């Protein structure tokens, strides 16, 4: 552990890049070490050390309780691999490969979803119905259905600003999936807070026709999209009440979707140090504001 500026100077002079990557400035130590009564969000700009805080916090929680199950996750597999390599920089620190095992489990969010659905096996069927309204032959199979196809089939009456893949992807991921909307009547009454574009009843009905076409094609194909799998995994965890982790730490949380957050919430029971989110709200690349 780097204790002060003199230690930082020693690291710089020695050229120890590994130590530099996990250098924790004294001003950051509170966030890495302080116990919280519940969930906590750490927000800061690029280069403020949020990732280092996340890595140190995961390691500290695992050291404080060797039986603790600690999840360290982020949006992409590459970022997760980088987090794992930083954890391994600590003397004697290791990551675990088994989902729900004691220690620090590092994974990209989509890989985490996959592991949860593999764990659920046939028990995932009810969760699929909760989210999509109908079963899928192989929920782990990646779907090739596109929104462009559904719009061409059922969205010809929609105005140009709505008849786009970008609109439907966002509507699906921020409204339909997290609220588990499976029927037109549900969609006509669901809240669309934060979407920035109001829809009349007639427009909602027209939008739903496209969603129905998209889901019908997905059902015929038998697979699911990444976004659908995240919502399905969250629904399964909620159904079973399985809390696979004691602590969940998220790096780059600004890039996650509402279904991802539902998943993370379901992974850990509410309590001390349950959820710790590190975000840069000015660098939202993939997700939408939650």
Q: Language-model segments: which ranges?
A:
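Extracellular cell-wall/glycan-interacting regions and their flexible linkers
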Residues: 7-10, 206, 210
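ATP-hydrolysis module of ASCE/P-loop NTPase motor domains
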Residues: 121-203
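Conserved helicase motor core of SF1/SF2 NTP-dependent helicases
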Residues: 17, 21, 25-69, 75-130, ...
């Amino acid at each position: 552990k780097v204790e002060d500026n003199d230690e930082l100077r020693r690291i710089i002079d020695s050229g120890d890049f590994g130590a530099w990557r996990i250098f924790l400035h004294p001003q950051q130590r509170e966030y890495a070490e302080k116990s919280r009564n519940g969930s906590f969000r750490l927000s800061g700009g690029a280069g403020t050390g949020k990732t280092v805080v996340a890595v140190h916090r995961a390691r500290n929680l695992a050291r404080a309780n060797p039986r603790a199950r600690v999840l360290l996750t982020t949006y992409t597999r590459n970022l997760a691999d980088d987090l794992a390599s930083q954890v391994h920089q600590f003397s004697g620190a290791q990551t675990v490969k088994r989902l729900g095992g004691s220690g620090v489990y590092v994974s990209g969010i989509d890989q985490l979803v996959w592991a949860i659905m593999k764990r659920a096996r046939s028990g995932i069927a009810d969760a699929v119905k909760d989210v999509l309204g109908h079963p899928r032959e192989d929920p782990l199979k990646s779907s090739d259905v596109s929104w462009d196809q559904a719009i061409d089939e059922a969205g010809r009456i929609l105005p140009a600003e709505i008849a786009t893949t970008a609109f439907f992807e966002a509507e699906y991921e921020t409204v339909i999936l997290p609220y588990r909307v499976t029927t037109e009547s549900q969609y006509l009454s669901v809240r669309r807070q934060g979407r920035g574009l109001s829809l009349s009843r007639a427009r909602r009905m027209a939008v739903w026709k496209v969603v129905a076409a998209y889901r019908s094609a997905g059902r015929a194909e038998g697979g699911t999209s990444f976004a659908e799998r995240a919502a399905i995994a969250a629904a399964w965890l909620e159904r079973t009440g399985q809390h696979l982790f004691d602590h969940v730490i998220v790096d780059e949380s600004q890039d996650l979707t509402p279904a991802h957050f539902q998943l993370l919430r379901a992974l850990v029971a509410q309590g001390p140090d349950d959820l710790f989110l590190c975000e840069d709200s000015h660098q939202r690349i993939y997700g939408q504001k939650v």
